[in-house]
Amino acid sequence: MRNLFCHSNPVPRIGTTIAAALLSLAALTACGEAGALEPLDRWRDGEREIRTTAPAVTAGRTLLAAGDYGNFRLTGEALTQPGAQAALLFHTDGESGYEVVFRNGAIDGTRKSGSLASVRNLYRSLADDGEWFGFEVTVRGRNIVVRIDTTEVVCYTEPEHPYRTQAHARQLLGHGAIALRGVQGEVAFRNLAIERLGAQARNEADTLPPVDERTDGVIRFQQRDFPVIDYHVHLKGGLTKERAHAMSMNYGINYGVAPNAGEGGVGRMLADDGEVYAYFDEVERMPFLCGVQGEGRKWTATFSQEALGVFDYLFTDAMTIID
């Protein structure tokens, strides 16, 4: 696999200097009842306490929410500016826990919105800069689900023996606070709310067995923020776009799913511009890269540049030329 991109923007962790503030905020908030929707509106900004469900963070600013959470469902909306990035941390004490990335824009090797940082990194954004988009983060037992708008982009089950590098040694589930951290530019949030889930809550849709990370190579790349992308996936042999979606989330591999434009290929075939646009409408909101493979010799004349230009990338090979 070629390293086409370099993630050159590592994000520091919150740091132990604010761990005491997290504990202080947790003490201010009652445990709450499972199933009760709570506005996430009490934050500590350094030494200052603020009340809002619409916070914004800029580079170097961290907001710590009151409360301690185990199983939960957190919902809200986010707005990114071009080049801006922020993180939502959970199960954190200032050093531990996971983070969800908020960053949009072109496919350029940076981690995109919905990434479970350094565990399930995503490289194609389903949201746009300058537009509000919904998100949801749910923790049930050992399972973490992240949604961008209505699309599930991460479904990760922490195995019994998770692999973590020294830098991510405390990137583990447990319980703890929620935090927002600015990385660069400004990211705004609104309508933040959190629902406590019972201790026995489980994701019934999580039917695939957890990956054994003691022997898994993908998690080793993910922990080092090395882009793990398979650009050449075809929908054939029983592989549907829905199954590709599930497999991508389970194995931690970003799939580039490509139909065949032209003649002579195997799998999903596109015959003209109309079929190109119809296919792209099907997959545009799915969390994988959208490529297209030119087949045969006629595809450059059969399809317009405008139609092929809707895809993230185009490639061809000489293995199945029939004309």
Q: Where are the model-predicted features located?
A:
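N-terminal, post-signal-peptide region of Sec/Tat-exported proteins
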Residues: 55-81, 85, 242-277
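Short beta->alpha connector loops
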Residues: 82, 235-240, 292-299
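Bacterial N-terminal signal peptides that target proteins for export
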Residues: 3-21
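Carbohydrate-interacting regions of secretory-pathway proteins
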Residues: 31-212
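Bacterial Sec-dependent signal peptides at the C-terminal "C-region" and cleavage site
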Residues: 19, 23-36
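Divalent metal-dependent hydrolysis catalytic cores, especially in the metallo-beta-lactamase
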Residues: 228-234, 243-267, 287-293, 316-319
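Extended substrate/RNA-proximal surfaces in nucleic-acid metabolism proteins
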Residues: 270-323
